[in-house]
């Protein structure tokens, strides 16, 4: 499980320094009336779904601001089920999860776009620890070394960076 670093979460757990930054993405069916959207304005009438307590739900509410309330589900798999059942037009989640959704959970769907990084605070991933855990400083030191040696970038380039061909949806 990946965890985005948020102020709310940081109040109850400790995070390592970020090791990966990603964008939010939009998953739709290719024949959706919203598939050609190039800006968030083109999504105002879309019924969008996201999992509760996620940065994706925050993104829908704070950046896209659709005319109808987003549909909220317990888990991403529930959002996928709603899309498969035709209950929502699309779902918003981070780009790596969007690749998984389109490949496994929502057959025939596409990543219609990724949102500009400037549209909201970056979605930084960090390792999660119980509050006060003494391992945080050790993990941060290891992450700093991996970053300084270029290993984090190498891992990202090999395993996590695929968004170049996905269209950008502007704010």
Regions found by a protein language model. Name each.
Residues 43, 83-84, 127, 139:
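Hydrophobic residues within well-ordered alpha-helices
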Residues 55-71, 110-112, 141-171:
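Ligand-binding clefts/hinges and TM-proximal coupling segments of bilobed small-molecule sensing domains
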Residues 1-42, 116-117:
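Acidic, polar ligand-binding/catalytic clefts
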Residues 31-39, 71, 132-137:
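Short helix-loop capping/hinge motifs at secondary-structure junctions, enriched
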Residues 39-54:
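Short loop->beta-strand "edge-of-pocket" segments that line small-molecule binding or catalytic clefts
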Residues 2-11, 61-62, 89-121:
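A ligand-binding cleft/hinge motif common to bilobed small-molecule-binding domains
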Residues 35, 71-85:
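Short helix-initiation/N-cap motifs at beta->coil->alpha
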């Amino acid at each position: 499980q990946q965890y985005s670093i948020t102020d709310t979460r940081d109040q109850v757990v400790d995070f390592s320094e970020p090791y990966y930054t990603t964008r939010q993405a939009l998953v739709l069916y290719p024949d959706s009336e919203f598939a050609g959207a190039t800006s968030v304005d083109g999504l105002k009438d879309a019924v969008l779904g996201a999992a509760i307590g996620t940065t994706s739900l925050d993104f829908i509410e704070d950046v896209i601001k659709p005319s109808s309330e987003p549909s909220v589900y317990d888990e991403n798999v529930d959002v996928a089920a709603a899309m498969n059942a035709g209950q929502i037009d699309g779902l918003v989640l981070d780009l790596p999860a969007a690749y998984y959704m389109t490949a496994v959970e929502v057959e025939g769907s596409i990543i219609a776009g990724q949102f500009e990084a400037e549209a909201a605070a970056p979605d930084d991933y960090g390792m999660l620890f119980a509050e006060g855990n003494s391992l945080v400083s050790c993990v941060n030191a290891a992450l700093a070394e991996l970053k300084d040696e270029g290993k984090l970038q190498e891992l990202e380039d090999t395993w996590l960076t695929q968004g170049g061909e996905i269209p950008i949806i502007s704010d």
